[in-house]
């Protein structure tokens, strides 16, 4: 997603709505009784109309200026950003992958995936690697023991990705001092870890109340929880289990690859994994009947995960959660990369979609 386009839209919208418009109205009111009131009124109308036109054009360019990924199998459609309300999150491209024979095997299950720009086309991603979702999905769609399915790829919020994907209720259970510390943490010299207040509840609500109804109404899909799944990696893994457990009546399962259990990049004295586990323990006790897939490697960023995933596994093992509904896989020697996730993508998809 082009953050410059998104930010431009918001700057124009908010500047126009609160400052730009009110500023001209104040000027106008102050000279309303003057000799030139009619001329000023006409000028103001022209300026406001121009602002509205700029807003409309800029909204459209969120979609138009973002290159469409190329796929080697199936076909890809980009949703019209103006067809969705986007009342809860910033507009961004959303791509829908369809099997080559769509809609012959309708109704289809739906996999909602995060980090949509990284899913299909390595030439479009920031690091020139991709999940190669189209290739794996096309192969699985040919198997009789797998539900036919489509994939909805939601592009992320760029600099605000961490704020959008960090599970909100666990975050809010941290002490005020720890929350403040996280908001002050720098990801790099120029970028904060959390670019804005954590808003993953809004993101999850967007998927459930804005995006899913649109997909259900415009594509030949099954709409029940047994055919609705969510999936992501790293921070996308966190938001996947969180969304599925917040909406267990909507999602039948979540796949969480290389789940970023630390929540930040601190290795010592980090309370975040503990609040995640406390949240999970409460949800597990509710027996939500949701499939949960976890995996991890042991190289690069994944080297942080083995002991943390082990604690999560113990929660499930100690509970009476249906053992057929969750599984964890360890991939020795694998790193925190799209190519590693692409290699094993068939495993979580099979777990979720097995007939």
What are these regions (language model features)?
Residues 8, 12, 16-47:
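Bacterial N-terminal signal peptides that target proteins for export
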Residues 65-355:
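Non-catalytic cap/lid and distal C-terminal segments of serine-dependent acyl enzymes
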Residues 59-64:
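Boundary at the C-terminal end of the N-terminal hydrophobic targeting segment
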Residues 21, 25, 29, 57-58, ...:
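Residues at secondary-structure transition points
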Residues 44-56:
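Bacterial N-terminal signal peptides
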């Amino acid at each position: 997603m082009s953050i410059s386009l998104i930010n431009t839209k918001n700057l124009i919208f908010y500047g126009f709505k609160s400052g730009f418009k009110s500023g001209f109205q104040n000027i106008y009111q102050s000279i309303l009784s003057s000799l030139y009131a009619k001329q000023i009124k006409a000028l103001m109308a022209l300026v406001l109309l121009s602002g509205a036109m700029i807003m409309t054009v800029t909204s459209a360019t969120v979609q138009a200026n973002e290159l469409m990924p190329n796929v080697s199998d199936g076909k890809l459609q980009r949703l019209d950003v103006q067809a969705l309300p986007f009342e809860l999150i910033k507009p961004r491209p959303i791509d829908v992958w369809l099997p080559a024979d769509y809609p012959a095997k309708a109704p289809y299950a739906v996999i909602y995936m995060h980090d949509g720009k990284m899913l299909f086309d390595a030439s479009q991603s920031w690091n020139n690697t991709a999940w190669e979702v189209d290739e794996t999905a096309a192969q699985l769609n040919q198997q009789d023991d797998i539900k036919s399915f489509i994939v909805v790829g939601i592009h992320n919020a760029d600099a605000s990705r961490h704020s959008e994907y960090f599970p909100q209720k666990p975050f809010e259970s941290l002490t005020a001092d720890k929350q403040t510390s996280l908001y002050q943490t720098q990801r790099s010299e120029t970028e904060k870890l959390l670019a804005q207040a954590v808003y993953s509840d809004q993101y999850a609500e967007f998927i459930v109340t804005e995006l899913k109804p649109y997909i259900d109404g415009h594509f030949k899909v099954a709409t029940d929880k047994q055919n609705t799944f969510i999936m992501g990696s790293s921070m996308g893994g966190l938001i996947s289990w969180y969304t599925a457990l917040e909406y267990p009546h909507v999602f039948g399962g979540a796949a969480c690859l290389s789940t970023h259990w630390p929540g930040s990049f601190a290795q010592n004295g980090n309370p975040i994994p503990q609040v995640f586990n406390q949240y999970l323990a409460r949800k597990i006790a509710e027996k939500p009947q949701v499939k949960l897939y976890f995996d991890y490697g042991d190289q690069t960023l994944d080297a942080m995960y083995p002991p943390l995933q082990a604690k999560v596994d113990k929660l499930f093992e100690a509970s009476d959660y249906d053992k057929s509904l969750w599984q964890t896989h360890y991939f020795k020697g694998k790193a925190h990369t799209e190519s590693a996730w692409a290699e094993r993508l068939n495993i979580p998809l099979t777990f979720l979609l097995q007939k």
